[in-house]
UniProtKB/Swiss-Prot annotation:
Domain EF-hand residue range list: 81-137, 140-175, 176-211, 224-259
Tissue localization of expression: Expressed in brain. Colocalizes with KCND2 in excitatory neurons including cortical and hippocampal CA1 pyramidal cells. Isoform 3 is expressed in heart and in umbilical vein endothelial cells. Not expressed in fetal heart.
Assembly behavior: Component of heteromultimeric potassium channels. Identified in potassium channel complexes containing KCND1, KCND2, KCND3, KCNIP1, KCNIP2, KCNIP3, KCNIP4, DPP6 and DPP10. The KCND2-KCNIP2 channel complex contains four KCND2 and four KCNIP2 subunits. Interacts with KCND2. Probably part of a complex consisting of KCNIP1, KCNIP2 isoform 3 and KCND2. At least isoform 2 and isoform 3 can self-associate to form homodimers and homotetramers. Isoform 3 interacts with KCNIP1 in a calcium-dependent manner.
Spans annotated as Disordered: 1-32
The name this protein goes by in its record: A-type potassium channel modulatory protein KCNIP2
One Pfam family here: EF-hand_7
Binding locations of Ca(2+) 2: D189, N191, D193, C195, E200
Species name: Homo sapiens
Keyword Membrane attached: yes
Region called Interaction with KCND2, residue ranges: 257-270
Length: 270
């Protein structure tokens, strides 16, 4: 029985990462370069070109308007994939299909990319920040990456597993408008107490401006982040009590055409 259980676990992992094709028996794996490009493109906030407006800050989970990444083709893979030894084995493919809105092929592509960047099967905060910094070589993305990491780390154990990763991506890329707004609210609610304060939003905005870098906006005024926060609260804090609740956040976003239009940027990313 013990040997059989181990065999099933290994089979699930091979099935998930696409290390063999059930029909041909051949490994379809992509090259490391292709995996890295795919993995990076799948994280939110891919290559923004401008500082966000209020509506963009509210609409995009990464607070910045991303460009549309190249569509992933799960079938365009090479024949030279070397399996990595993973310490954390993800849940079975069928279970992840039920829990997310990704297809079998998409999950396999995602897993190969995740395992290439994170051979242990999990990513800690420091590794996450290192990966994320590749988006913004001109600035300091470490603080914002910490906020984003905490949003993916839903059980607060200090690591993001593949299950955590695809659960977050499923909401961002395939979730309903309400799903995405709830995810964005959770990102901005830094202490997870159910409301966004001006201090929290100021920390978010400062991290975004730091991430963009002074070389992108050399003439940026020091008070710009605080002004952005005031604009945010003027739009969102409907009862003027100094905090934004999830109800205020969702209601305000749903009434803003620009925000709703921005939410569609994440459709069909993969």
């Amino acid at each position: 029985m013990r040997g059989q259980g181990r065999k099933e676990s290994l089979s699930d992992s091979r099935d998930l990462d696409g290390s063999y094709d059930q029909l041909t028996g051949h490994p379809p794996g992509p090259t490391k370069k292709a995996l890295k490009q795919r993995f990076l493109k799948l994280l939110p906030c891919c290559g923004p070109q401008a500082l966000p407006s209020v509506s963009e800050t509210l609409a995009a989970p990464a607070s910045l308007r991303p460009h549309r990444p190249r569509l992933l083709d799960p079938d365009s893979v090479d024949d030279e994939f070397e399996l990595s030894t993973v310490c954390h084995r993800p849940e079975g493919l069928e279970q992840l299909q039920e829990q997310t809105k990704f297809t079998r092929k998409e999950l396999q592509v995602l897993y190969r990319g995740f395992k290439n960047e994170c051979p242990s099967g999990i990513v800690n905060e420091e590794n996450f920040k290192q990966i994320y910094s590749q988006f913004f070589p001109q600035g300091d993305s470490s603080t914002y990456a910490t906020f984003l990491f905490n949003a993916f780390d839903t059980n607060h154990d200090g690591s993001v597993s593949f299950e955590d990763f695809v659960a977050g991506l499923s909401v961002i890329l395939r979730g309903t408008v309400d799903d995405r707004l709830n995810w964005a609210f959770n990102l901005y609610d830094l202490n997870k107490d159910g409301c966004i304060t001006k201090e929290e939003m100021l920390d978010i905005m400062k991290s975004i401006y730091d991430m963009m870098g002074k070389y992108t906006y050399p003439a940026l005024r020091e008070e710009a982040p605080r002004e952005h926060v005031e604009s945010f609260f003027q739009k969102m804090d409907r009862n003027k009590d100094g905090v934004v609740t999830i109800e205020e956040f969702i209601e305000s976003c749903q009434k803003d055409e620009n925000i709703m239009r921005s939410m569609q940027l994440f459709d069909n990313v993969i």
